[in-house]
Amino acid sequence: MTVKYSINELLVDHESLSDNFTCPICFDLYYSSSSKKEVFQCRDGHLACKSCWSDSLLNKKECMICRTPVNSMNELSRNRFIENEFLKKKVYCPNSFFFIENVNVDDSSMNEALIRDESNGCKEIITVEALEKHQVECQFRFEKCPFTGCDKILRLKQIAEHKIDCKFSSKYCLHCDKEIPGQLDAHALVCPKVRIQCTQSESCKKSFPREQLRLHIDQDCKFTIVKCKYCCLNNSKNESIDFKRFELADHYEKVNHSFEMDKVINNQQLELVECKNQIYQINNKYEKLLERVIKLEQLSMDASNKLSLLPRFKNSIIFATFSTHKLKRVNEGISTVPLDVGNNKFKLTLYPNGYDESNKGNISAYLYRVSINEPAVKVSFTFVFNNQDSRKNRTYRIQEYTFNGGATSGWGYPKTLKTVDVDSANGWLTDEDKLVIGLRIQVLP
């Protein structure tokens, strides 16, 4: 649990801040609520945060202050001196304030929400650079009570004392060998391992774990009421068919059940015949289903063999000096040479700044058929935008699309990566300024 704050509220000496530490465009400090911002400058030394530069260069290729031409982020230099100087500023520990729930960091009332806790708060004054590490180690940070059901939020130093008296604290049950939240007395009334006496009759003196009670009553307890399995078939003699389990053996010995037993045997024989018929029918159904499965497996194998014989293309496409292409206008694309896939030719076309105005600022990727006077062809195709960190690769797949014969036709994704994000810092470009896209094309039957 952390105190919500803006870095401006933690500063010990606001007067020591100069305009050099504030972005002249968005007027925010060069530091977010949890990490420093990157500061970039034009060749004439005018500063702004990275996000402001990125947004501005999408509209105008110039410095926002002096109008010096700036074609891309690669033409800016990073001002680490300003970044590091801000990290040396002194701040109060966030845990010097009271914890207040449901406070938004961006709320305009934030200054009113943060209140110093002079009695119990942290007294440390640290640098901005040490802030994150200190918060992890601070003994005055806020923690939620670990016991289920307790919603109290306390300082770490107060948790140990609170746990002693917390009504939701866990207790160890010797019977079930578990930590139990709440009171042990209440748990003992339902604990499956607590030994209890049989509840079927006071005459039964046996005891066992609670979880075995139902099994004992159903199968073992001699005082459980049971029925004679024969008398229920013919009760014309008005004999009682309910007995305590220990009386049943005596009943079977004294009463002749031969007639009833014959009925049971006859019924079982009829049931046996019915079961045999059902087994025969099930076996027939099984044989038919097995035949269908074999046929389907053969069809699947034939389809796979046919698909493997169909034309396909798989290779990596490299777009060199891609940073220069990011300056292209909307609907201005760059294409590969024609790629042979069987009797068809295709080309991959990228629109670095969008195919049209609706996807401006995004890279649009389309596959075009350039074969002339060829019949329609159905394909599946995949674009894989490769990142230096392969875990971040982006895959875009079209399961099925039919390219019509004759006229040039194309299909793809109007929005893939954001244009501004495609640089070497984010891993989308190599050190040689190359964008690498894996392309797979499969002709379908």
Swiss-Prot record:
Q: Which residues form the MATH domain?
A: 314-441
Q: Any idea which UniProt keywords this protein has? A: Coiled coil, Cytoplasm, Metal-binding, Repeat, Zinc, Zinc-finger
Q: Which GO terms describe its cellular component?
A: cytoplasm; endolysosome; pathogen-containing vacuole
The record's GO molecular-function terms, alphabetically, read: ubiquitin protein ligase activity; zinc ion binding
Please indicate if the UniProt record lists Coiled coil as a keyword: yes
Q: Which residues form a coiled coil?
A: 269-307
Note whether Signal occurs among the keywords: no
Family per record: Belongs to the TNF receptor-associated factor family. A subfamily.
Q: What does this protein do?
A: Probable adapter protein and signal transducer that links members of the tumor necrosis factor receptor family to different signaling pathways by association with the receptor cytoplasmic domain and kinases.
Q: What is this protein called?
A: TNF receptor-associated factor family protein DDB_G0290971
The scientific name of the source species is Dictyostelium discoideum
